[in-house]
């Protein structure tokens, strides 16, 4: 069915979001059109505000509204441990369990030879710089249990062990192929408590 151009454009915009197919995009577009002008204006304002005000922490790579972020500047955090994650959403999942008190480093992706993503394509250089100028003695690799997550964790292990840094990874209470951001708090807590050395 042909929709008027403004709705078709809105459907197209929604369908560009991850996990949103054409049917859901259509539903969202029609819902948005049915919202009050005040609600639409607030939604648009919040979207633009988030886009303008958020940045990536220059230290850890986490999405934040201050740089460096509040975790990197918190003197009460354990400065000897860095938890390496794929995505900023994973930081939020780990913080929710309130059991890990060290620092983070967000890679913004994983090494994926099949997709042409090499170590140079993810946020590894800044991790190496951090490790050279710090008291970090352990790096916990918390990549998802996928082929790319495993490739990334093995690469980090081979890179860091010769430097005398202990490299561990989360215990596998996480199902293979599962995303950390969707894991429940008990599973994440057990994974961090029972991490294994690589």
Swiss-Prot record:
Protein name: Recombination protein RecR
Gene expressing this chain: recR
SUPFAM superfamilies (alphabetical): Recombination protein RecR
Family: Belongs to the RecR family.
Keyword Metal-binding among record annotations: yes
Single Gene Ontology BP annotation: DNA repair
Domain Toprim: 80-175
Cross-referenced PROSITE patterns: RECR, TOPRIM
UniProt organism field: Streptococcus pneumoniae (strain Hungary19A-6)
